Amino acid sequence: MLYKGDTLYLDWLEDGIAELVFDAPGSVNKLDTATVASLGEAIGVLEQQSDLKGLLLRSNKAAFIVGADITEFLSLFLVPEEQLSQWLHFANSVFNRLEDLPVPTIAAVNGYALGGGCECVLATDYRLATPDLRIGLPETKLGIMPGFGGSVRMPRMLGADSALEIIAAGKDVGADQALKIGLVDGVVKAEKLIEGAMAILRQAINGDLDWKAKRQPKLEPLKLSKIEATMSFTIAKGMVAQTAGKHYPAPITAVKTIEAAARFGREEALNLENKSFVPLAHTNEARALVGIFLNDQYVKGKAKKLTKDVETPKQAAVLGAGIMGGGIAYQSAWKGVPVVMKDINDKSLTLGMTEAAKLLNKQLERGKIDGLKLAGVISTIHPTLDYAGFDRVDVVVEAVVENPKVKKAVLAETEQKVRQDTVLASNTSTIPISELANALERPENFCGMHFFNPVHRMPLVEIIRGEKSSDETIAKVVAWASKMGKTPIVVNDCPGFFVNRVLFPYFAGFSQLLRDGADFRKIDKVMEKQFGWPMGPAYLLDVVGIDTAHHAQAVMAAGFPQRMQKDYRDAIDALFDANRFGQKNGLGFWRYKEDSKGKPKKEEDAAVEDLLAEVSQPKRDFSEEEIIARMMIPMVNEVVRCLEEGIIATPAEADMALVYGLGFPPFHGGAFRWLDTLGSAKYLDMAQQYQHLGPLYEVPEGLRNKARHNEPYYPPVEPARPVGDLKTA
């Protein structure tokens, strides 16, 4: 054994060839600060071996290296800029020394090689991969850019265009694509990986392959003419500005850095990467996006823990076809759980099957599946007008109209047709689960399962625990949601549960702004362009359906009369009374017409002004700051109340529910992350300016207490140890 660290070791293989093996404790290899330091020590040992002829890098895990250790990021990013820059220089010196070894090097790459894992293998001369490879640089999705030389080596290896596509979008690619663009040199079956890598290494040692020529371009300026460079970078900057926008600085910074570094050799180019990385690491956007990644891991880990002792449902049923029922049936069947879809009329069943078929055909058009797979999936959805096959189902989700009487009747009837241990769930969006449970003989086998529309796109499923829902019931439904590829978050029962309960105060803030003379177009523009929501409140209401919102508003007002009961007629009432229900009937805040792709396109409609004039004061202008404050304070206050009341268990789950269920701007990280970034004391000062607007603007007591000491909701993070202790030499 030449060297043994905690996460990697170095040993001789044969006749002057050494192997460096990543083998961390636990299930995956990560390139954390300790591993980077250990890698440096191992390379130091290699540099002393006069008889070294070649080096093989490999992993003892199912994945090569999944990336840097993101759990270290928040503390690492709190380190002062100069120290962080110093540590990056040290880390890059390690990869440079790997690249500069006086012998050929090859990485045998299996499974994932992402972020730092990808940057590590870019420093070797050759890369041989297995068919399950996923390789790429996802850093821009975390609000940063590659920091271990990825923005320097990848463009020089692949050419600017292919590298920019991966780096700016934070993409990873599979084995075939990686081979096509030159990111790997070959793809072999897993059992042939080491043998194949050794064969390439021997050829390089024997002089049959010119490894020095392979290495050289990575050390030099980018080979691009002035015209080529102008074309590549101008197009890339235009594309990034369009897709990422101003709220995500990392992608455009990465492109500009690669452009600036194009005329330099490796050392100067790495210095530019360092100078760009460090300020990005200190942005609120990076903290928020890293926070989302960590929260996502936490939520998924919690679901895994919850379901470890239950069997995932093998057969499901959906009550109520239509668009929602068809979407749920498709998602279940697509992920391998056959489903019976029941309705009381053929027309709805046809609609449900058409929806499922439409979604499968889209997969076919995109080349994700072939005709055989399509036929196989659709054959596992069984439409029916009766209860045939219900004695075999493990879980049933009811997705009929949002009416408690209808839902109770359907659930009670279904309970008589299924096994004693079958779990029933209701896809209600507002009706309390404990109320629906009153109609059942086995309320312990019942819970809520709130999908979001469109089902195939929206990652969140709210799992609602009723007063009598058993732990096993919740676990089974969480297991089914996870199997469907969704992110399940368990919440306690109340009107609107979590997501809708916090959404309607936001809509109430919108209604009050309109009442006070604000222009709905300006509100939408500010909430989209400045705050970053995917849709402003007016457009969102049109998409949700004015009739749906009108009904839900009444349910919420009955549930929380002290805050959500209005004492005035608002814009939602006015549009509802005028039969303007939004996109579904082509008339809402806007008029809708289908574009060439059959998608609804909004147009101005003068008739809306007259309707809104009836429920509004004369038009007046509001500042962007006031619009954001008046829209967000009611939502944030309600989010905090939900945490204080135990409706949602943690700030992490609340923020993920908002991001995945409502499209809360990821660069803010969710309501609690936004609140922590702003500071609870500053938030309280802002909210108190608007408390005259009513109970929705009254800050909950728990938040007031935090504001006294400006306490955050997330546990405070300490900066990483001084970077000198992280090994900078």
From Swiss-Prot:
The UniProt keyword set, sorted, is: Fatty acid metabolism, Isomerase, Lipid degradation, Lipid metabolism, Lyase, Multifunctional enzyme, NAD, Oxidoreductase
Q: Which family does this protein fall into?
A: In the N-terminal section; belongs to the enoyl-CoA hydratase/isomerase family. In the C-terminal section; belongs to the 3-hydroxyacyl-CoA dehydrogenase family.
Per the record, which residues fall in region 3-hydroxyacyl-CoA dehydrogenase? 311-729
Give the record's pathway: Lipid metabolism; fatty acid beta-oxidation
Upper taxonomic classification of the species?
Bacteria, Pseudomonadati, Pseudomonadota, Gammaproteobacteria, Enterobacterales
Question: What Gene Ontology molecular-function terms does this entry list?
Answer: 3-hydroxybutyryl-CoA epimerase activity; delta(3)-delta(2)-enoyl-CoA isomerase activity; enoyl-CoA hydratase activity; long-chain-3-hydroxyacyl-CoA dehydrogenase activity; NAD+ binding
Residues of the region (Disordered) are 708-729
Q: Does the keyword Aminoacyl-tRNA synthetase apply?
A: no
Q: Where does NAD(+) bind?
A: 324, 343, 400-402, 407, 429, 453
Q: Where are the transmembrane segments?
A: none
Q: Where is this site: Important for catalytic activity?
A: 119, 139
Q: Name one GO biological process term.
A: fatty acid beta-oxidation
What is this protein's name?
Answer: Fatty acid oxidation complex subunit alpha
